[in-house]
Amino acid sequence: MAKADVKMPDEFLARISRLGAQTDSIAEKVLQAGGEVALAKVRSNLKAVVGSGNKSESRSTGELERSLGLSPVMVDKNGNHDIKVGFSEPRSDGSSNAKIANILEYGTSTQQAKPFLKPAKSAVKKQCVDAMKSAFEKEVGNL
């Protein structure tokens, strides 16, 4: 059987070893970059649907929009890093921001649905991936 030895350049091997040591910090920065893109789109969609298309004057306090944000980067039980776009809790009146967002997204028997999360997810998927790729390239380039 034939035998082959592949010699990697020392600089490449050094960068790979540094990458391994900084995986968590790089993953945080990459996910943060993608999360910011998604957050901006969700925020703009939310502003567009809140108070629009109502038969009566809007009673929006702006609290739902202000509570929208990004979670810190977390590591799940399988070792995967993730970040979430969501609402901080609770509201000043004691109700749940997630409940209000769910009512807006899916509607009720008396209120028409005004989706803002699902359209944002569909619209920014490619942009998020591109932002994450460029953040990754930048971080790897700094090694």
Predicted regions and their residues:
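Short, Lys/Arg-rich flexible segments
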Residues: 1-84, 92, 98-143
